[in-house]
Amino acid sequence: MVTLLENPFRTGLRQERTPEPLILTIFGASGDLTQRKLVPAIYQMKRERRLPPELTVVGFARRDWSHDHFREQMRKGIEEFSTGIGSEDLWNEFAQGLFYCSGNMDDPESYLKLKNFLGELDEKRNTRGNRVFYLAVSPNFFPPGIKQLGAAGMLSDPVKSRIVIEKPFGRDLSSAQSLNRVVQSVCKENQVYRIDHYLGKETVQNLMVFRFANAIFEPLWNRQFVDHVQITVAETVGVEERAGYYESAGALRDMVQNHLMQLFCLTAMDPPNAIDADSIRNEKVKVLQATRLADINNLENAGIRGQYKAGWMGGKPVPGYREEPGVDPSSTTPTFAALKLMVDNWRWQGVPFYLRTGKRMPKKVSEIAIQFRQVPLLIFQSVAHQANPNVLSLRIQPNEGISLRFEAKMPGSELRTRTVDMDFSYGSSFGVAAADAYHRLLLDCMLGDQTLFTRADEVEEAWRVVTPVLSAWDAPSDPLSMPLYEAGTWEPAEAEWLINKDGRRWRRL
């Protein structure tokens, strides 16, 4: 299947922007992210003729690999995790721009070695001094890596040098502020691309178009018509091989502070003055500044955690979180988190936003659901079917699309109603598959477009919102007090209470 960017019917309709020749250096190049996501996305852009022929990719990691071995590993990744190599001629052309440099993240000599190597490649490949440095490494390597890049003078050009930082950006408000200070000590904000791959998903990007390009919806997008909003990111997988990271992170750090808060911002923000990076990010910061936990004095009314226990997934038994390899048998790390947020502004005053995420849930699904208020007078009370409130749901994954639920009369002589859905699907409407999120984000970074990347103050405001719950959950607690939910179910009973006490209920997806 072709992707949106290679749709043959679009050829010649408009000129696609192509980045300037540059060198993309990936730190942590021997890791899964590089092989599974980054290089396959770059190769797909090459297939779509979106990249200059001079584009050069340099892998940087501790392993003592040769250029050829790095190329072999990246080819395996493209064949296994993407659409395949396609033309051998195209692959050979692409491989000529793949290089490898071994070194340590905290070793100054490694950076001088890298700097000299990039200088040689710059002359050989004619990349004109343009550099992108991608930190696809463990978060504890962010500060030393950024400092060493600065000390080596590789971030000194505010126009030609950029740095991409993967999530998580800090583990709390204090560490995020500290990391921002490190970044700001060596480069300017316009050089920094804090990446959240959820912002590269088509449905997420379409949310602003849906809201601000259609007169029918935005007038209803407020407290007058909206009863509440639910944002769900559910995963079927367990902790898998990430126990070392997950034990120190948990669901709130891993998913809520970044992915769910970004979805929240795009749902709740006011219209920007223009579709550019600063205008959009200004509005996201404004709505975060107006956001608070529903009950700061009684956190049980604002946040619920949980942890999966042994259960069944796809007809097979799976272990509980505490039984996973590498996990403390008495761990109180949450694998489920639910928050109730309130926004103190004219648009949303009194409208609750319910956020939830968890591992080992029945389905892998991400959705934003806006539930509208019930009609003021139910004139069809004599009808056997009880009228349901209208719900607008935006499906981020799987099957990207939008659905509107409403009431309709059933065929026949009697007045009977039924709840029906009006659906929009990307696949069926455009006849193309949505491009991978990293595809769009990498291209935007190469083009110097920061619209889909988070700004320093935005990151800090998101941490501020969740900090009270985070502090409470980080405090030592009795393992027996941790709410549990069976693998293959939606959430612990306590999370049901969080929304049921308001006369509402979680959507069953």
Curated annotation (Swiss-Prot):
Substrate binds at H197, K201, E235, D254, K359, K364. It is an enzyme of class 1 (oxidoreductase). NADP(+) binds at R62, K167. Pathway: Carbohydrate degradation; pentose phosphate pathway; D-ribulose 5-phosphate from D-glucose 6-phosphate (oxidative stage): step 1/3. The keyword Oxidoreductase applies. The active site is at H259. Its EC number is 1.1.1.49. One of its GO terms (molecular function) is NADP binding. It catalyses: D-glucose 6-phosphate + NADP(+) = 6-phospho-D-glucono-1,5-lactone + NADPH + H(+). Keywords: Carbohydrate metabolism, Glucose metabolism, NADP, Oxidoreductase. Signal peptide: none annotated. SUPFAM superfamilies: Glyceraldehyde-3-phosphate dehydrogenase-like, C-terminal domain, NAD(P)-binding Rossmann-fold domains. GO terms for biological process: glucose metabolic process; pentose-phosphate shunt, oxidative branch. Belongs to the glucose-6-phosphate dehydrogenase family. This is Glucose-6-phosphate 1-dehydrogenase.
